[in-house]
């Protein structure tokens, strides 16, 4: 299954949670989910009982859409997490957090992961001083992520950094806002990653 490219606000309403897909609109309380917190369609406001499989599928979809990965990429990451020692669900979230597009978002250089992915693919991001245009590039502890010199005055990047004064920056990156670079200091602990995903259902789904 390819990466989702449809209306993101309709997707959030269908899943019933904010997936951080609309950035500033969500912060301002102007997203479709804020205005209509129920599923789209004629029967969207009806309450329906969801099956165990439905729960498992919903949590997988939430994680996939939030991080902007395809089914193939997601399954590959899950398989890697399952091979490692430790909590498979927590390891999966850690691997997703290491994606370059996600790290760019976490450092506050983009208001959404989708925009962060565009910055990466269009050559606006450097890793350790070299251009990397692969969103799935795995960032490791100690690596320097920087906005390219030509892009440091990009108004969307400047605005995203300004918004971090309101949203804050996660604890596992150190960011020099004025110089527009940051260091990925470590892989976060699961409890540090605040996302509306219950990964145990994902583990159950793929373990069948």
Swiss-Prot record:
Record GO biological process: ribosomal small subunit biogenesis; translation
UniProt source species: Campylobacter fetus subsp. fetus (strain 82-40)
Gene: rpsD
Record GO cellular component, one term: small ribosomal subunit
SUPFAM superfamilies, per the entry: Alpha-L RNA-binding motif (SSF55174)
Residue ranges annotated for the S4 RNA-binding domain, each copy included: 98-161
One Pfam family recorded for the sequence: Ribosomal_S4
Keyword set, alphabetical order: Ribonucleoprotein, Ribosomal protein, RNA-binding, rRNA-binding
SMART domains: Ribosomal_S4, S4
One GO MF term attached to the UniProt entry: rRNA binding
Similarity comment text for this entry: Belongs to the universal ribosomal protein uS4 family.
Protein name per its UniProtKB record: Small ribosomal subunit protein uS4
């Amino acid at each position: 299954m390819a990466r989702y490219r449809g209306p993101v606000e309709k997707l959030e309403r269908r899943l019933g949670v904010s997936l951080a897909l609309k950035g500033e609109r969500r912060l301002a309380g102007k997203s479709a989910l804020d205005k209509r917190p129920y599923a789209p369609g004629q029967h969207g406001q009806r309450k329906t009982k969801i099956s165990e499989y439905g729960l498992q599928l919903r949590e997988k979809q939430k994680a996939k859409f939030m991080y902007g990965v395809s089914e193939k990429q997601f399954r590959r990451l899950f398989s890697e997490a399952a091979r490692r020692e430790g909590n498979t669900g927590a390891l999966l979230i850690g691997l997703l957090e290491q994606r370059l597009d996600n790290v760019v978002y976490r450092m506050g250089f983009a208001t959404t992961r989708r925009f962060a992915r565009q910055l990466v693919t269009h050559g606006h991001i450097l890793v350790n001083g070299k251009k990397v245009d692969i969103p799935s590039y795995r960032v490791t502890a100690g690596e320097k992520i920087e906005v390219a010199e030509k892009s440091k005055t990009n108004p969307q990047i400047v605005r995203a950094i300004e918004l971090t004064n309101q949203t804050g920056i996660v604890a596992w990156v150190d960011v020099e806002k004025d110089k527009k670079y940051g260091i990925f200091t470590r892989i976060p602990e699961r409890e540090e990653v605040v996302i509306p995903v219950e990964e145990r259902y994902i583990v159950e789904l793929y373990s069948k």
